[in-house]
Amino acid sequence: MDRSDMMHVMYDKKGPKVAENFAKRGFEAYYCPTKEEALQKALALIPADHVVSWGGSVSINEIGLRPYVLEHYQVIDRDAAASPEERVELMRKALLCDTFIMGTNAATEDGQLYNIDGNGNRVAALVYGPKQVVVIVGMNKVAPTLEDAVVRARTVAAPINKQRFAAPTPCIVTGMCADCNSEGSICNQFVRTRRCSPAGRIKIILVGENLGF
């Protein structure tokens, strides 16, 4: 058994239990061993007549969800904006869509989400607005404790994510979080989601593969 196989075995052992822990906190939660199964589960959760939007996420692209939604659903796509002003308006409209799809920076084994956001539109939609939120969570994002999840979000996810943006920050240069107060920081909103209310509004799809960063 090679390293990759061992990883999947461990994910398959842990994933269903983590899904159970999310369910105990009011989330609707599923474990899917593969990206392909995760895509089918996500599509089964999104009615054909829903207007769909999304937050910045590598994971929703890696399972093929965003490309499928773009082709088969009515969407609110900020990347289709013709100007910065229109982009902002589309991001605002996305807060009232039917289904919002996103990834997460970190999750915990006891069933919590932890996210860091720049503009705040992604975490705003998670907290309130869309009728439902579908969150794609690679098992590599699952940390043992909340403290570990915070460390993961700040020192792993955020510095890597920041490499996609031009505004200079210390982590672009060093690859490490400096807890900066830079104008170009994407670490502006820190949101812990410890329960889902109303119950079932947030759907968690845990995936037995490494997704995103």
Q: Which residues are covered by each model-predicted region?
A:
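SAM-dependent methyltransferases
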Residues: 1-25, 30, 50, 86-89, ...
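Conserved phosphate- and dinucleotide-binding cores of soluble alpha/beta proteins
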Residues: 95-213
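N-terminal start-of-chain detector that recognizes signal peptides
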Residues: 1-4, 23-26, 73-75, 86-88, ...
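Short, functional N-terminal and low-complexity linear motifs
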Residues: 4-10, 35, 116-118
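N-terminal active-site beta-alpha-beta segment that forms phosphate/nucleotide-binding
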Residues: 11-91, 96-100
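Unusually extended, aromatic-enriched hydrophobic runs near protein termini
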Residues: 1, 11-18, 63, 70-73, ...
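Generic serine detector
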Residues: 4, 53, 57-59, 182-185, ...
